[in-house]
């Protein structure tokens, strides 16, 4: 091309671009011109406060259980049981403002641990510096290194844990003082065989940098966890034999060692350990003088995975403890002592126990919530003796109940109960020890809800994709719903193991309905509350069972005249992003559009602990990994796909999105991408997401 022709081409290019600028700028406000925008703007702010809930806060018993105080409507009130009168005490302190989104204030960053730990007697401080454990006086003086071998070249570290332990085992500490402050236990990690992942950070700055993290992906070598105990006075280090002298191998219990603490008397170091497959879990005690271990409780679930961190609660003697287990196929409660002796089976239910509410040793009673209402979502308060006898349900099974420990009177004669369902707003009552209602304390005010014309959420029952069981979902309607019209449907999804799409908690409709959509959420066979045996349906099949059940939920609505089955979208973040992409790709007959944010796209790409718990390793479950691989279904793409990822996501790496994008490009598919520069594990902006759905499910004829 001659110089003249180049100049002419350049002038034409500039002219063409300048012509496009005004149109492009105007297009930035296109959501404001879309159907439903004004209705959404008008209603979304109103919906949030449309119901004055009939709930009480901060219940506190007074006068040996004769009265109690509570907070409601920014005031403190006192209720007298004998007179059944409520009197105003004064103004309540406003609730503290949250310090921000994400992790609780003061907690380490995602996947990390606290970098220091002060001894119980406040005299000493342990801290991690340059991959080694150090000790000093509490004021920082007289510091010295307990370990010196930790270094970046050898990829070893002390007093810190590998990222995957923090993320998947909730291990936010790596140093543990004994109760008498005489010893400190700590982690040693060897990451020399665990592959590194290079994450590029600061991509919006002049120079970017690389964050290098040992990140073992499914089937890859894991970091090796060891534990040591340092005796302050003796200056002696003892290695804890976390694997009973066995080598670090997949089958060995002790492949993972976590949830570390000292026994209340300080005589033993306690921790949980599992094999790599995570179908065996042992609650273990180590002798701090010798490092030898003994098993207190062993839990096994050969068909799939064992719960890795069962809730436990010590009794007053600090020797006996309440333990929960899924060994029967449903979570139940047991009483053990630290010798490992089973003292009592406290519950034997063919349904799930949810959580322990209160233990009253003097009265010999335990209160807990269980899922034995009219359906598994309706929590009920139970009371049982600490010998396992006289188990009684205290609440009405027609409702879902909430009772906190503070709501039960000191003498156990009464409790404050809040009840609700998906379509009955919460109300609060005073109940006696026999389950009889003593007084109505509060009920929800639905005046504004009704004035706005809001619609109650509908509970849906449908068959799982394989027809094996009933599942539930919820359907949200716009305030101006007209059953004679057809509406596009959005599915809000997460769908990961233990997630619930349906709920018996009262909720106002999803504000996205005001754009002119129906919005639904559906359970899967892996949802919470169905029991361990039911959840096993997803084992080795992530990305198949849950997605097929989402499609089954959508198809259960096809016979409703007001549902436009050809205009169904699905959205979610993280596992929900994965579910969104897979549903669109696996079930093009059910879904027409998907917004997939921060999505795993292949289980080959995710970490060992989470992935292998449900999928085992790809070397021994190739069919399962391939069936859950989004790239396998690229040719199925018929609808519209929006992909979002954060460039600094250290949980679901950008590699996931990149591999999906590459596969789509190679297949010549049309799709959209939104990127969060320097953003971590995050979601797509709601306004951009709704813009995408309106364009593809409403305006695209």
Each predicted region: which residue ranges?
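Bacterial N-terminal signal peptides
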Residues: 11-22
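A short helix->beta-strand "capping" segment at the edge of beta-propeller domains
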Residues: 31-56, 102-106, 235-243
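Non-catalytic accessory segments flanking enzyme active sites
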Residues: 55-60, 65-66, 71-76, 86-107, ...
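Short coil/turn segments that connect the beta-strands within blades of beta-propeller domains
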Residues: 65-66, 121-123, 180-182, 265-267, ...
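Alpha/beta-hydrolase-fold serine-hydrolase catalytic core, especially in secreted/extracellular enzymes
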Residues: 73-74, 288-289, 328, 336, ...
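A flexible loop/linker signature enriched in serine peptidases of the S9 family
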Residues: 75, 123-134, 138, 148-172, ...
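Short loop/turn segments that connect beta-strands within beta-propeller blades
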Residues: 81-84, 138-141, 232-235, 288-291, ...
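Serine-hydrolase catalytic core recognition
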Residues: 196, 257, 266, 396, ...
